[in-house]
Amino acid sequence: MILTSFGDDMWLLTTLLLWVPVGGEVVNATKAVITLQPPWVSIFQKENVTLWCEGPHLPGDSSTQWFINGTAVQISTPSYSIPEASFQDSGEYRCQIGSSMPSDPVQLQIHNDWLLLQASRRVLTEGEPLALRCHGWKNKLVYNVVFYRNGKSFQFSSDSEVAILKTNLSHSGIYHCSGTGRHRYTSAGVSITVKELFTTPVLRASVSSPFPEGSLVTLNCETNLLLQRPGLQLHFSFYVGSKILEYRNTSSEYHIARAEREDAGFYWCEVATEDSSVLKRSPELELQVLGPQSSAPVWFHILFYLSVGIMFSLNTVLYVKIHRLQREKKYNLEVPLVSEQGKKANSFQQVRSDGVYEEVTATASQTTPKEAPDGPRSSVGDCGPEQPEPLPPSDSTGAQTSQS
């Protein structure tokens, strides 16, 4: 909220208010408007106010028609003065000048109190200025003025006036003020309503994200104009992150002719009036751009990888089966061969040249010779282990040997 304090000199405040009529409409070629001087729609008894009717008319033809509470009055001048206002002057005022349409109504209220909160108007459109004045009876000075909205203070002023240069929806509420004269006074509440000019924009894309490279993408900054103003033109700006894509264009669309991976990011838009009195930003919209993809359909890729997986599983099972069969066959062939060779190996003995017996065990793979415990060992080729030396001959044989 932008607040500006003023002193007793009201020229700046008056200049601020005259460009916007009381009814909240900009001067146009079809509708008349009413302005007030001084610019307050609430005044004390015995105070003066002048209403001015402005609108299109032919040169030299400024004939004006005034309406009070719906009844035409016999006044044909562009100005309507109320000297020393009374309660009977309270009511609804309209005017029509030249070829214009009747103006929007202005509600004038006459009060009798010690302290009065004056407003430039009670109903206005966001972006328009609002002037407030804490006014003492018979223009008595008021010090240490505090302004309140909905019961909460929002401005302390050393003088009695304050202005909100650009109103928004949060400025709607019940306003009052308090100040010190001979005593501490508090004004009655005044209802101020700020109407929305256009809705908060929403950024939408023509295609769903993510989308492939090369896609044509149109971004649309959508908003609804709630109040029609003659000559009103909205301006649209587009951004990605902090980068400006397009600034203050009258078109609500932005085109990405051929999307690339670099175009991915968070996009948002901004809508503003021509004088930037109302400016609103949309939420962010994330755009994701996919890299190059095969032209084959998705179901083809699923079927392909499923087939590869099945073939791999079958090959693994077959390999394990074949390997197991080979091992079983080899085992069945080796067992009989080893058994037969073992029997033959145990059925013969061999006598060495030195008279020592040795037994040879032969198998299909190797033989191991065995030597008698007390005699020398001899290796015979690949024979099996040597057997112990046979027992000596009987006693009779030994006797014959000793005799000889």
From Swiss-Prot:
Sequence positions bearing Phosphothreonine: T368
Membrane topology: Single-pass type I membrane protein
Region (Interaction with EPB41L2) location: 321-342
A molecular function (GO) term: IgG binding
GO biological process: antibody-dependent cellular cytotoxicity; antigen processing and presentation of exogenous antigen; antigen processing and presentation of exogenous peptide antigen via MHC class I; cell surface receptor signaling pathway; defense response to bacterium; innate immune response; phagocytosis, engulfment; phagocytosis, recognition
Family, as annotated: Belongs to the immunoglobulin superfamily. FCGR1 family.
Record-given protein name: High affinity immunoglobulin gamma Fc receptor I
Source species: Mus musculus
Taxonomy of the source species: Eukaryota, Metazoa, Chordata, Craniata, Vertebrata
